Amino acid sequence: MNPGILIVGSGFAARQLVKNLRRQDGEVPIRLIAADSCDEYNKPELSHVFSLNQTADALTRQSFGDFAEQFQLTVHPHTRITAIDTQQKMVRSGEQVWHYDKLVLAIGAAAMVPQVPGHELMLTLNSQQEFRDSQLTLLQAQRVLILGGGLIGCELAMDMCRAGKQVTLVDRSGSLLSGLMPVEASCRLQHALQQMGVELLLNQQLGALTQHDEGIQATLSNGRQLWVDAAIASVGLRPNVGLARQAGLQINRGIQVNNRLQTSQVDVYALGDCAEIEGQLLPFLQPIQFSAMTLAKNLLGAAEAVKLPAMLVKVKTPSLPLQLAGETRRQDLSWTIVAEPQGMIAKGFDQHQQLRAFIVSEDHMKLAFGLLKELNALT
């Protein structure tokens, strides 16, 4: 009997792949194995649980049993794969062994925690289980330190402030969202957060955390000390590559795959936050959706290359929502920025005056799809 397709992981990437496989083939055996509960939840909602006063359990959308029944697959929750044998085409968890015809690693990425003294006091919110583990502390905390002014850090800072907490956001760069956009565009969000009451400490790094009876003492690189009830690390994600390394797959920042999502080993693929697609890490929902559609076809016999158009990235900060697309990180773009009371439009042009990126906020977000169409016409 054909052992079929074996997927390691149960997050958004894995589920998108299962759904795409079943749209094309109702018979191929699918087995999904993951270390977590395998229940479905919407990960972006983790950035808004505090203002909505939600618990971790309230985020669950579908149990693993219902998912398995709906899409006709075998699911193994709370099962950690400890080894892969690509020669024998099998995976192992302790004494248990499963064979595969095609193997997909959709094992995600882990939140990075700066290795400063007291780093074990830092919390992360990269999964439903991580929120479940820390929700009592975070829901009760009044003074919160957020380390990292990127996408998730800004979303959490605004949400916690809306929930009535005293929030301090620390980032080593000189502006928010520095990995996504120029300072001229992000200053509007910076002003909005400060107006809400978020204390922004930019060009600063965390030096140490110390637990005391009255709370956690955070010491910054400039010597300043803060007293907080909780500290959250939001400085980025590191792809989970340990299992792939053990299996002899080529890894760089993530598990290296080509444009067909194939790893360096035959019949082994990677998808989602763990995958490095031709040198790029793309930990956003839309690239994963496109990749899952392509990979499903390839697992069923095709040899298609994933095509990733310019896609919208949404910054879910309700008091000042933003959308961006294109090569916003390019250093050689010339930006034109129009800031009005009803919103901002920022356009990045290359040396040939071709539109290569844009950022829109508030009421001007209605222009996003037209600008996106213009971007994709150039590719």
Swiss-Prot record:
Catalysed conversion reaction: 2 reduced [nitric oxide reductase rubredoxin domain] + NAD(+) + H(+) = 2 oxidized [nitric oxide reductase rubredoxin domain] + NADH
Cofactor(s) in the UniProt record: FAD
EC top class named in words: oxidoreductase
Listed pathway(s): Nitrogen metabolism; nitric oxide reduction
Principal location listed in the UniProt entry: cytoplasm
Entry's Gene Ontology molecular function annotations: oxidoreductase activity, acting on iron-sulfur proteins as donors, NAD or NADP as acceptor
Alphabetical UniProt keywords: Cytoplasm, FAD, Flavoprotein, NAD, Oxidoreductase
GO cellular component, one term: cytoplasm
EC id: 1.18.1.-
Xref: Pfam families: Pyr_redox_2, Rbx_binding
Compartments (UniProt record): Cytoplasm
Recorded family membership: Belongs to the FAD-dependent oxidoreductase family.
Alphabetical list of PANTHER family matching this protein: NITRITE REDUCTASE [NAD(P)H], PYRIDINE NUCLEOTIDE-DISULFIDE OXIDOREDUCTASE DOMAIN-CONTAINING
NCBIfam families, sorted: PRK04965.1
Function: One of at least two accessory proteins for anaerobic nitric oxide (NO) reductase. Reduces the rubredoxin moiety of NO reductase.
Record protein name field: Nitric oxide reductase FlRd-NAD(+) reductase
Protein species of origin: Serratia proteamaculans (strain 568)
Name of the gene this protein is made from: norW
